[in-house]
Regions:
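Short glycine-/acidic-enriched loop or helix-start segments at secondary-structure transitions
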Residues: 22-24, 75, 153-155
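C-terminal substrate-binding subdomain of Rossmann-fold SDR/epimerase-dehydratase oxidoreductases
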Residues: 89-222
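Structural signature of the Rossmann-like NAD(P)-dependent dehydrogenase/reductase core
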Residues: 10-15, 64-70, 108, 143-144
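Active-site loop of short-chain dehydrogenase/reductase
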Residues: 3-11, 61-62, 94, 136-139
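Conserved Rossmann-fold NAD(P)-dependent oxidoreductase catalytic core, especially the SDR/UDP-sugar
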Residues: 1-39
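Active-site Tyr-X1-5-Lys
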Residues: 5, 22-25, 36-64, 89-90
Length: 222
């Protein structure tokens, strides 16, 4: 409603890879793949997408929807997996990894600065679609993703490597600890790549910088 008053040139609706639900091996969802959320969080994000589309159709708000894979970065919430891993490694504690032997969940990761770069690229290089009355159409939409797919164990191993410490871990049943937690999500970034966007900083360099920042600022993960 506030956007209707101020009339922005573009309204970015941030969403998640979770709205499409779990993927099969090798599958990558495109921008308008079916919405099949598995848990209440993903359903709430899908609802936000639906509301933004309704405002685009009803009021011609300049909506652009973005769906993003797992973000990480300096000053990330302490409750997020990469921070939990580093905190436990620093304290020489066991890191719980969701999954079983040979069946550990995976995620695509992207640094938050790369996401910001993608958003600025979209704003500079695209123009929001306008709704045409009585036409079955939809707003513009982009997946912001990477090619950096790691299992939770692989991510923990990289963090331990960059810390120069040993990783102690145990596999735990994710269905009992996190109901509705999907094994894998995956988005295709082909649409944005065709426009010319590329990640400015690699995953390994980004993660190494984040780990070092948290080692230099231990109060953040205590």
């Amino acid at each position: 409603e506030y956007a209707r008053e101020v009339k922005p040139e573009a309204f970015i609706q941030f969403s998640t890879d979770e709205t499409s639900g779990p993927c099969e091996d090798g599958q990558r969802f495109e921008e308008w793949s079916p919405i099949l959320p598995s848990n209440p969080y993903a359903a709430s994000k899908a609802s936000q997408e639906a509301i933004s589309i309704s405002y685009w159709r009803t009021y011609d708000l300049p909506i652009i929807i973005t769906n993003t894979v797992n973000n990480f970065g300096e000053m990330q919430q302490p409750s997020k997996f990469p921070v939990i891993v580093q905190k436990k490694i620093a304290k020489n504690e066991v890191v719980p990894i969701h999954g079983s032997e040979g069946n550990i969940g995976t995620r695509y990761y992207i640094h938050s600065r790369n996401v910001a770069d993608a958003i600025l690229f979209i704003l500079k290089n695209t123009t929001p679609y306008h709704h045409i009355p009585n036409k079955v159409d939809r707003p513009d939409r982009y997946n912001i993703t990477s090619d950096d797919c790691l299992s939770n164990l692989e991510l923990a191993q990289k963090i331990a490597q960059f810390m120069g410490k040993e990783l102690k871990y145990e596999l735990v049943d994710h269905h009992s600890t996190r109901p509705g937690h999907d094994k894998a999500y995956s988005l295709s970034g082909e649409k944005l790549e065709k426009l010319g966007w590329k990640q400015p900083v690699s995953f390994d360099e980004s993660l190494k910088n984040v780990v070092q920042w948290q080692m230099d600022n231990p109060q953040w993960i205590e």
